[in-house]
Amino acid sequence: MPPRIIILGAGIIGLSTAVELQQRHQHRSAEPRPSITIVSAELPSQPSEWTEDPRCRPSPDYASMWAGAHYRPIPGATPQLQREAQWAMDTFRRMRRIARDAPEAGVRMMPGIEYLEDSPKEYGRLRTGDRYAGEHDEFRVLDKAELPEGVAWGCRYQTYSLNAPHYSRWLLDRFLAGGGQIVHRKLERLEEAFTLFEDGSQPLVINCTGRNFDQDDKMRIIRGQTVLVRNQFDRTITRQNRDGSWIFLIPRPFAGTIIGGTKEPGDMEVKPRMETRLKLLENCVRAFPEFVDRLEDFDVVLDNVGRRPWRDGGLRLEEERIEDGKTVIHAYGAGGRGYELSWGIAKEVADLVLATERSKFECRVSENLK
């Protein structure tokens, strides 16, 4: 019987991890390839399905379906941010390859522009030609003459933007085409994963649930609301206001542009607020008139509300041994950076999985030689 891996959650971390594990095992011949199963209460779907059948509409807790999503680097000012910066650059490298080799995936390379009304010291140290998003990112600090009124610092670089529901579905299709299995089921506790299959196997469980079944005191919910419009744009722009709020444009390949956004800690409201939509559109007209300069010119498609699973101290990524020799690898709590960090996290999870498998394989060989 091949070893069994169970991945809990079909968000961007779970999907990326599943595909990464499949690809890594293709190059290993000394050990049997594992059976990989994703167990999730919800699965990726397209917005066109949401309008045709409301039952297909994702819940706000399935945050990966409601994401922008683009890559905006954050300088590594703390050990956790330095770790995330490496994951982000690993992801940038992979996304660039996907954009080149699989245009149907919904990932597109484009210019990224940032404007900061305040300039933290970690940004002030950056110089044109530095590596910001990743290798060959054409990073350039903007001259003062290029900055809008009220902006203290700005930059331009090459980044990616993606269509979150489309890309997630593309990943799921790749996983299934590679022999992966799906169990469409909601679990109440992590321990249930070990009894899903009655074949006597001892699965390795990877916890990509986002919130860890609400069993982690460090977890917080941050509500985000954005607006999807049909209006098209050719670059992604982010402006950080002096009060810490943000205004951003995220082109969505095949489907318009995302305008955002909000960060509302502890707010569990699932319905979009119309006053928030109006404020987002007004802010966009004021900050980015080169995109749309009149409210009446917006062609609104959809309001997005997602509840981001944010964790104090950063995402939890570690192996845990629990009773009876059971192994869990945790990878949850990425907050609003799931897509930006996805392939870097998946790579590190896969490293842990392969190390665990290697150890078990060597133990079996040793036992057989006795």
UniProtKB/Swiss-Prot annotation:
Recorded catalytic activity of this chain's protein: D-aspartate + O2 + H2O = oxaloacetate + H2O2 + NH4(+); D-glutamate + O2 + H2O = H2O2 + 2-oxoglutarate + NH4(+)
SUPFAM superfamilies: FAD-linked reductases, C-terminal domain (SSF54373), Nucleotide-binding domain (SSF51971)
A Pfam entry, by short name: DAO
InterPro entries from the UniProt entry: D-amino_acid_oxidase_CS, DAO, FAD-dep_OxRdtase
Effect of residue 248 to Y: Increases substrate-binding
Gene3D superfamilies: D-Amino Acid Oxidase, subunit A, domain 2 (3.30.9.10), NAD(P)-binding Rossmann-like Domain (3.40.50.720)
Domain of life of the native organism: Eukaryota
Protein name per UniProt: D-aspartate oxidase
Organism encoding this protein: Talaromyces thermophilus
Lineage of source species: Eukaryota, Fungi, Dikarya, Ascomycota, Pezizomycotina
GN (gene name): DDO
